[in-house]
Curated annotation (Swiss-Prot):
Transmembrane segments: none annotated. Residues 265-272 are annotated as: G4 motif. Its main location: nucleus. This is Guanine nucleotide-binding protein G(i) subunit alpha-1. Keywords: Cell cycle, Cell division, Cell membrane, Cytoplasm, Cytoskeleton, GTP-binding, Hydrolase, Lipoprotein, Magnesium, Membrane, Metal-binding, Mitosis, Myristate, Nucleotide-binding, Nucleus, Palmitate, Transducer, Transport. It holds the Pfam family G-alpha. GTP binds at residues 43-48, 150-151, 175-178, 200-204, 269-272, 326. The gene is gnai1. It comes from Xenopus laevis. It catalyses: GTP + H2O = GDP + phosphate + H(+). Its EC number is 3.6.5.-. A lipid is attached at residue 3 (S-palmitoyl cysteine).
Length: 354
C-alpha cells in the first residue's frame, strides 16, 4: 500500500503550514511595531518632540489645525507678559518709564476682558510698549527667579505679526506653544518600515502615577531633559532644583527592573537656550562641585556625565545620548533618524530578523 496522505491529513498539514506562516507574519509585524515612551520632568520638551513627529513623519499641521492654535499663541503671549509684570513687583524692579505703570494696569483690565482667539489693537499696543520698557527687560533677564514660558521672547518679539487680524500661526508658532500635558497622548506614524506608537506622558509630579500601565512591552524610552533648567526650580516645588528633579526621575527609570531590556535614549534638550544661558548663569548653581569653565561644550559634557553615571548597569546597558533642540525640525529629524537605527539594531536582532 503506497504512503499517500489522506485528504484529512493533507488538510492538517495545510493548517499547520498556515499557522506557522501566521506566527511568522505576526512575529515580523511585532518586530516592526515600535512602542516609544516619552518621559521627563515637566516642560522638558516632550510634547514638542511629538509635534515634530507630526511635521516630519506626517503631513504637518494643516492651515485649519494651525488656526486652532491661535488662541493658545495669544494666551501664551498674554500670560508671559503678565508673569513678567507680576515678577517685577516681587523682585522690586521699577519701570524704566514711570508711565508704563498705567499700561500695566491697563494690561490686566484688557487681558481679563479679552475674547479667546482674539487680540485687540489696544491690547497689542499695551503689550508692545511694556515689552520695550527697560525695567521689563531687566525683569525678563532675571526670569530664572520666577516661572516663565520658554517661548515668551519668541512671541513678544513678533507681536506685530501675531497681532494682525489675518494672523494664522506657522508650524514654528505651533511648535512653540505651551499647553500642560495631562494624561497620556498617543501618536502613530510610520518610518523606515516601522510602525511607531509614541506615548507622551504628563511630566508634572501629579501626573506620574498615570504612567504605570503604559510601560509594558515598551521598545524604547526617550527621556527628555531641559539643559537650560539647571538654574531653575520646579513649578510644583519651589525648593527643588529642576535638574536635580530630572536626575532623580532618570535614576528611577534607568535602573527600573521593568526596563532591563528597554533601550534608553537620553535627549539633552533646549541646547540653544542652554548655550545662551551658560554665558551668564554659572553651572555651579546646580553642581557646586563643577570644576570646569562656563563654556557650552564643557558644561554640556559635564551634565551628560552626571546623567550617564546614574546608570547602575553600565556593563550591560548603554544610554544613547543626543543633544537636541526640540523646536528645530532639522535637528530633531537628524536625531530621530539615528534613534531609529538604534531601535532597529537592538530590537530586530532579538527577533532573529536583523
Amino acid at each position: 500500500m503506497g504512503c499517500t496522505l489522506s485528504a484529512e491529513d493533507k488538510a492538517a498539514v495545510e493548517r499547520s503550514k498556515m499557522i506557522d506562516r501566521n506566527l511568522r507574519e505576526d512575529g515580523e509585524k511585532a518586530a516592526r511595531e515600535v512602542k516609544l515612551l516619552l518621559l521627563g520632568a515637566g516642560e522638558s520638551g516632550k510634547s514638542t518632540i511629538v509635534k515634530q513627529m507630526k511635521i516630519i513623519h506626517e503631513a504637518g499641521y494643516s492651515e485649519e489645525e494651525c488656526k486652532q492654535y491661535k488662541a493658545v499663541v495669544y494666551s501664551n503671549t498674554i500670560q508671559s507678559i503678565i508673569a513678567i509684570i507680576r515678577a517685577m513687583g516681587r523682585l522690586k524692579i521699577d519701570f524704566g518709564d514711570p508711565s508704563r505703570a498705567d499700561d500695566a494696569r491697563q494690561l490686566f483690565v484688557l487681558a481679563g476682558a479679552a475674547e479667546e482667539g482674539f487680540m485687540t489693537a489696544e491690547l497689542a499696543g499695551v503689550i508692545k510698549r511694556l515689552w520695550k520698557d527697560g525695567g521689563v527687560q531687566a525683569c525678563f533677564n532675571r526670569s530664572r527667579e520666577y516661572q516663565l514660558n520658554d517661548s515668551a521672547a519668541y512671541y513678544l518679539n513678533d507681536l506685530d505679526r501675531i497681532a494682525q487680524n489675518s494672523y494664522i500661526p506657522t508650524q514654528q508658532d505651533v511648535l512653540r506653544t505651551r499647553v500642560k500635558t495631562t494624561g497620556i497622548v498617543e501618536t502613530h506614524f510610520t518610518f523606515k518600515d516601522l510602525h511607531f506608537k509614541m506615548f507622551d506622558v504628563g511630566g508634572q509630579r501629579s501626573e506620574r502615577k498615570k504612567w504605570i500601565h503604559c510601560f509594558e512591552g515598551v521598545t524604547a524610552i526617550i527621556f527628555c531633559v531641559a539643559l537650560s533648567d539647571y538654574d531653575l526650580v520646579l513649578a510644583e516645588d519651589e525648593e527643588m532644583n529642576r535638574m536635580h528633579e530630572s536626575m532623580k526621575l532618570f535614576d528611577s527609570i534607568c535602573n527600573n527592573k521593568w526596563f532591563t531590556d528597554t533601550s534608553i535614549i537620553l535627549f539633552l534638550n533646549k541646547k540653544d537656550l542652554f548655550e545662551e544661558k551658560i554665558k551668564r548663569s554659572p553651572l555651579t548653581i546646580c553642581y557646586p562641585e563643577y570644576p570646569g569653565s562656563n563654556t557650552y561644550e564643557e558644561a554640556a559634557a559635564y551634565i551628560q556625565c552626571q546623567f550617564e553615571d546614574l546608570n547602575k548597569r553600565k556593563d550591560t546597558k548603554e544610554i544613547y545620548t543626543h543633544f537636541t533642540c526640540a523646536t528645530d525640525t532639522k535637528n530633531v529629524q537628524f536625531v530621530f533618524d539615528a534613534v531609529t537605527d538604534v531601535i532597529i539594531k537592538n530590537n530586530l536582532k532579538d527577533c532573529g530578523l536583523f
